[in-house]
UniProtKB/Swiss-Prot annotation:
The name this protein goes by in its record: UDP-N-acetylglucosamine 1-carboxyvinyltransferase
Residues holding phosphoenolpyruvate: 22-23
Keyword Protease attributed: no
Localization in the cell: Cytoplasm
Pfam family, one: EPSP_synthase
GO molecular function (one): UDP-N-acetylglucosamine 1-carboxyvinyltransferase activity
GO cellular component, as recorded: cytoplasm
Family listed: Belongs to the EPSP synthase family. MurA subfamily.
Known EC number: 2.5.1.7
BP-aspect Gene Ontology terms: cell division; cell wall organization; peptidoglycan biosynthetic process; regulation of cell shape; UDP-N-acetylgalactosamine biosynthetic process
Function: Cell wall formation. Adds enolpyruvyl to UDP-N-acetylglucosamine.
Organism name: Rhodopseudomonas palustris (strain BisB5)
Modified-residue entries (2-(S-cysteinyl)pyruvic acid O-phosphothioketal), positions: 126
Pathway note: Cell wall biogenesis; peptidoglycan biosynthesis
Length: 429
């Protein structure tokens, strides 16, 4: 199993290109199943999750051709994907594939919308909280689907097709909004999604669907309206830049000091996180090529943050911020409101010498003068990269184990950091 070895203490200087957003690329790939024509997606990140979803879609008969593959890239896909779902041969998504990634459960929406039936295993993925699929099932039932759970599978049928309806989520759900959006695109009549998620990735998927002929308005607001159409056609769409990757590298620069240009980043996608970094004493400069992040000489100031749905501070940057605050001059407080059980990185950060106390949903981080390298183990995608951030500033050597989590969500992380002066290498085997 691969590991990453880091020798801390180097400031970061240079340019890091920001990849396409994983959290947009995955639903966009799934949305391609709504049409029998080809969807071309540009700026798709080369990630393990993208490769896994390609296998899952291939199981249904979807043909995906990767263009721009680099020499030696056997696992990851190219930056441009040509996706053709002309012939869907199977409406069952098996456990052995779906159990590896929760987002793959979303195939239930295009299968129901286009084929009027689906049998999809209950999902897997990062072990963060329970993340029940109840809200997704509720949304599909509102659209007229008949659903039951049989031996670990959700069995869904809509013999007469899906019908437009009002779907009001009791709480904001990104997964539920994605599923409702895709299913309603081909439903008969008008669908209203109330209390919809406002994340930029939702807007990106809606923009792509509109290019394919859907009639969607209000994406990016809590109220989305979809007028169903009978057919969607092919299109070409560029995946928006990854705001979580942007924030992650910004915090890495803040942690080590130095100055890095985040090329292709869009500040409006993570303004809340940039505001928090500014409060912490980091210099953020927006320019034509993205965002420049710098911390030269000044210490890190403590902050108090509560995670929230967009446009609030993203839960997917909570672990990275916690790593940064381990070096702050004073006590910081981070409250997690989106997912339960999302403090699994605390125990591993403590191995560096971090001082963190948990009280329910709130972590109090007392900054320390030094972190020391240690062997650590990644527990999930975002927690794993928080360990990398800590290691970059720690004295001595850190070995990060179980880095397959990193490969799920960060494209060429060690290459990007190494190019900016970090001493970091992947050790295979």
């Amino acid at each position: 199993m691969d590991r990453i070895r880091i020798i801390g203490g180097n400031k970061l200087h240079g340019t890091i290109p920001i990849s396409g957003a994983k959290n947009a690329a995955l639903p966009l790939m799934i949305a391609a199943m709504l049409s029998d024509e080809t969807l071309i997606l540009d700026n798709v990140p080369r990630l393990a999750d993208v490769a896994l979803l390609q296998r899952i879609l291939g199981n249904h008969g979807v043909d995906i051709m990767a263009v721009g593959k680099r020499p030696g890239d056997h696992e990851y896909q190219g930056q441009t994907l040509h996706i053709s779902a002309k012939n869907i041969i199977d409406t069952t998504a098996p456990y052995d594939l779906v159990s590896k990634m929760r987002a793959s459960f979303w195939v239930i929406a295009p299968l129901l919308a286009r084929m009027h039936e689906a049998k999809v295993s209950l999902p897997g993925g990062c072990a963060i909280g329970t993340r029940p699929v109840d809200l997704l099932i509720m949304a599909l039932e509102k659209l007229g689907a008949e659903l039951s759970i049989d031996a670990g599978y959700v069995v869904a049928k809509a013999p007469g097709g899906l019908k437009g309806a009002t779907i009001e989520f009791p709480k904001v759900t990104v997964s539920g909004t994605h599923v409702a959006l895709m299913a309603a695109a081909l439903a008969k009549g008008t669908t209203i999604i109330a209390n919809a998620a406002c994340e930029p990735e939702i807007t990106d998927v809606a923009d792509c669907l509109n290019k394919m002929g859907a009639k969607i308005t209000g994406a990016g607001t809590p109220r989305i309206m979809i007028e169903g159409v009978s057919k969607l056609h092919g299109a070409r769409h560029t995946v928006l830049p990854d705001r979580i990757e942007t924030g992650t590298y910004a915090m890495a620069v803040a942690m080590t000091g130095g100055e890095v240009q985040l090329s292709g980043a869009r500040p409006e996608l993570l303004q809340s996180a940039l505001d928090v970094l500014t409060q912490a004493g980091v210099t953020i400069t927006v320019n034509n090529d993205g965002i420049k992040v710098a911390r030269n000489g000044a210490g890190i100031s403590p902050v108090t943050v509560t995670t929230a749905p967009f446009p609030g501070f993203p839960t997917d940057l909570q672990a990275q911020l916690m790593a940064l605050m381990t070096r702050a001059k004073g006590a910081s407080h981070i409250t997690e409101t989106i997912f339960e059980n999302r403090f699994m990185h605390v125990q591993e950060l403590a191995r560096f010498g971090a001082r963190i106390q948990l009280d329910g949903e709130t972590a109090t981080i007392d900054g320390v003068a030094k972190l020391r390298g240690a062997p650590v183990m990644a527990t999930d995608l975002r927690a794993s990269v928080s360990l990398v951030i800590a290691a970059l500033a720690a004295e001595g050597e850190t070995m990060v184990n179980r880095i397959y989590h990193l490969d799920r969500g960060f494209e060429r992380l060690e290459e990007k950091l190494s190019a900016c002066g970090a001493t970091i290498e992947r050790i295979s085997g």
